[in-house]
Amino acid sequence: IGARCFYRCEALERVNIPSTVRHVGTYAFNATKLYTNEETDYVYVDSWLVAVKNQELHKTVTKLDLKQGTVGIIDNCFYKAPILEAVQLPDSVRIVGQYAFSGIETLVRFEAGKNLEVLQEGAFANCTGLYVLLLNRSLQEIGAYAFYGCSTLDNNSLDGNSIIPQSVKRIGAYAFMQTMLWGKPENNIIYAGNWVVGFAENAKLGAAELKDSVVGIADNAFFQCGTLTSLKNLSKCAYIGTAAFYECTALETVSLNPRLETVEAYTFYKCKSLFRVSVPTMLRSVGRSAFYGCSNLKTLDFSESAVFASVGDFAFYGCSNLETVTFGENLTGLGRYSFKNCSTLTAVELPDTVTAVPEHAFANCSALVTLKLGSGVTSIGDKAFYKCAGLSEVVLPDSVRTVGKSAFYKCVSLATLTLGNSLERIGDFAFYND
């Protein structure tokens, strides 16, 4: 529910918020009857705390006491509360909104309830006095900048093991930057518990090694680390975040955890030295621009995973040395521009589970000579095989109904074309060759 979503809906007096809602923006219900008719200082909509009606309350409360049954806390709810010292959430709270407790310099202690799932972006940013952090064992996500600028926060242990519970599946970008953790790198790598959250400034990492207990890599953890060439123990990481190795231009090889399910968006973006990637046996998807511009990558075999299903937009765009790709039998989704400008790719074989070849998917794959489309393909998007100059034969299966504009534009070697019996439309310039 976005910021000011129902602002000044003055007749609104009842709302049921479903359990699927994970975010309520600032002022979402202000100036409604829900707000104006509330007689207490805290304004609740269904089970969400959506406002502190009396801002003077911030000047008197040192310990927060929310009612049992509260499910979520709205964005910015206690922003810069001047004397709040401790927060202990009831077990019912699942979600703490963006910057909900940020900027509270007096806050020393935060204790999550048993069912907290998400700390959203900046939830405790710049709480400079925060020292005691007790997170629960069902927490799944710590958002970007969640504890940014908490300058006294250290790696206090949870059960003698880690400040981060084992249940956590994602840590956002710079969640612990400018905390005490940032000043205590281990071999130039910065950890929050058993998670990698960054690297030391001006570090020359080279062939680096993660500690044996490592479980995950946060978003942007090695962002533009131009000296990293390899990373031992990366295969221990069950979670690797968005843009984790963004523009690590010297990174050459990576060995991924066999149980890794997703290569997130921009994970290896423009890692131009990367030439070998192990495909996890449980891999399900590759995100947007995950390997964009990995110009030294030569081969990919997704058939090593029996559950591999989707390739995101721009995922392998500009992998100019990529020669072979094997998709396996369960691919269903192929992204726009996903293999565009893969100029050395020689063969594409799509399984019967693929229903569409989207726009620009294999455009400018000038070395492509073999194309086999599965029997499930119903559409070929605009410029899908644009300027694939090596193609000499194209067979469209009977399932194909539409061929988009310029789909095979300037395929200058094309000599044989077989059209399926279900074809309904061929777009402008589809097979044009000037």
Regions found by a protein language model. Give the residues of each.
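Consensus positions within tandem repeat domains that build extended binding/scaffold surfaces
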Residues: G2-Y7, T26-A28, D75-C77, G97-A100, ...
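Structural signature of tandem-repeat unit edges
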Residues: C9-H23, T32-D46, Q55-G72, A81-I95, ...
